[in-house]
Design a protein with these regions (language model features):
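C-terminal motif of bacterial Sec signal peptides marking the signal peptidase cleavage site
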Residues: 23-26
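Beta-strand cores of secreted/periplasmic/IMS beta-sandwich domains, seen most often
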Residues: 57-60, 86-113, 147-155, 159
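Extracellular/periplasmic metallocenter environments
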Residues: 29-50, 135-194
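A mature extracytoplasmic/lumenal domain signature
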Residues: 74-76, 95, 102-105, 113-117, ...
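A eukaryote-biased signal for short, well-structured alpha-helical docking elements
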Residues: 40-70
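N-terminal edge beta-strand
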Residues: 63-96
Length: 194
């Protein structure tokens, strides 16, 4: 019994099929370059400091003056690496608050302390606490800008720290600020699961 001799057409079919199979398998195991570039670009723009690992780098307290100092870094639709209420700044009652705002993203951002009740506001311009907002709250500050918010808080309450640029807070750029009557010192970190 003899095997059939490959014809000219059949001679190229096997290498072609093997080449296509290699291409398909090889491509399916690699990351898409455009996705990898977007992910690395986002990682590069996201602040390296996350509160769950560096609380003391973001919040401090002077007990003598009852002053909480908080560093608020605006990243790509996040605060200090958190968004959508996933972090909470907890402060003692009647504290004096100093928020050092750092705009670290290429998209304009601002900050405002808004009510913690009801839906997340679409934009700023209606602070829940007097003087608790940055300059250019609706238009936002450019990358590299800094600002300082100084205000006092009441005995208790739940608020949101939002980006006041229209659509940013509803897009997830907000975290909680809670005035806890039992708190003796401030803290900042992931919001406890309820």
């Amino acid at each position: 019994m003899s095997l059939p001799v490959p014809t000219r057409t059949a001679a190229w079919a096997l290498p072609y099929a093997l080449g296509m199979a290699t291409l398909v398998v090889g491509c399916s195991k690699q990351e898409r370059p455009d996705v990898a570039v977007r992910q690395s670009s986002l990682a590069a723009r996201t602040p390296a400091v996350r509160a769950d690992t560096a609380d003391s780098q973001l919040v401090s307290f002077d007990a003598a003056s009852n002053t909480v100092t908080f560093k608020l870094v605006a990243g790509p639709f996040n605060w200090n690496g958190f968004g959508n209420g996933q972090a909470t700044l907890t402060v003692p009652p009647k504290s004096n608050i100093v928020v050092n705002f750092v705009q670290d993203d290429g998209t304009p951002h601002s900050a405002e302390v808004a009510s913690g009740e009801g839906p997340v506001p679409n934009s700023g311009g209606n602070p829940a606490i007097p003087r608790a907002y940055t300059n250019k709250v609706v238009e936002g500050l450019p990358q590299g800008a800094t600002d300082v918010m100084k205000f006092s808080v009441p005995d208790s309450g739940k608020f949101r720290i939002i980006c006041g640029v229209p659509g940013h807070a509803t897009g997830g750029m907000w975290i909680w600020m809670v005035i806890d009557p039992s708190a003796k010192t401030p803290s900042f970190g992931p919001t406890p699961k309820s």
